[in-house]
């Protein structure tokens, strides 16, 4: 099966990514006040930022910059506007600039949505499943945000939770939910059948991204999961098969 490397992911000819050694960025950073996230851009608000640092930040963010980041590096409103008007940059979302126009690969598309929604947030559901190599890329980015957050930009599907921090993979960039919660989030979607959910569980375990025990532990905290009873049985069967 043919595959190509795209900034930390191996994209197969079937359209599913395979994680590579560069799939995690481990520079220390803070997702928000009180939310510790280890992966992500090396620059954080409040830190000094020069033009060279801005270029490095764009590279870390798949050629994307936020308006706040540009301003922190000393770019004035007129400079930013000129770069957009001249076609040197394009707007991915309001306040989000693509510094290499025409780039539309999955990582850029999803990171643009993540930056547009703002912190704290993480790619979730089918978007996170794509990044974990479990599903095809969905037509719209899915993000998990804290309960009570404002509406998302057009074209972005937002899911709200009171447990965001506990469900985010602390090492991955772009920020995303961990494998166990990604599988359970997808299985909780009304559009996913039980057979599809079982296949997703089996695939995650077969790829050794997680185990039935780890999935069961995550499921234990989801009393209202629509497939809870079915998944308990499935995880028991999968676990028994793995031990035999």
Functional labels for PLM-detected ranges:
Residues 238-244:
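Acidic-basic catalytic patches of nuclease active cores, encompassing PD-(D/E)XK
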Residues 2-231, 237:
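Short gly/ser-rich loop at a beta-strand->alpha-helix junction or flexible surface loop bordering the NTP-binding
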């Amino acid at each position: 099966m043919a595959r190509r490397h795209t900034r930390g992911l191996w994209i197969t000819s079937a359209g599913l990514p395979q994680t590579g050694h560069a799939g995690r960025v481990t520079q220390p950073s803070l997702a928000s006040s009180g939310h510790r996230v280890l992966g992500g851009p090396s620059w954080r608000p409040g830190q000094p930022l020069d033009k060279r640092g801005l270029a490095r930040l764009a590279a870390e963010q798949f050629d994307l910059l936020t308006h706040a980041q540009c301003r922190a590096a000393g770019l004035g409103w007129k400079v930013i506007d000129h770069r957009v008007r001249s076609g040197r940059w394009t707007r991915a979302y309001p306040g989000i600039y693509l510094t290499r126009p025409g780039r539309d690969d999955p990582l850029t598309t999803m990171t643009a949505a993540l930056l547009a929604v703002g912190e704290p947030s993480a790619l979730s559901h089918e978007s996170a499943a794509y990044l974990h190599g479990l599903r095809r890329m969905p037509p719209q980015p899915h993000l998990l945000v804290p309960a009570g957050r404002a509406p998302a930009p057009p074209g972005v599907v937002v899911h709200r939770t009171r447990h965001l921090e506990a469900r985010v993979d602390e090492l991955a960039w772009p920020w995303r939910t961990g494998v166990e919660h990604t599988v359970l989030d997808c299985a909780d979607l009304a559009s996913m059948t039980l057979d599809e959910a079982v296949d997703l569980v089996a695939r995650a375990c077969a790829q050794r991204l997680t185990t039935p025990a780890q999935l069961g532990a995550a499921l234990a905290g989801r009393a209202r999961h629509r497939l809870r009873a079915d998944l308990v049985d499935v995880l028991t069967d999968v676990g028994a098969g793995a031990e035999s």
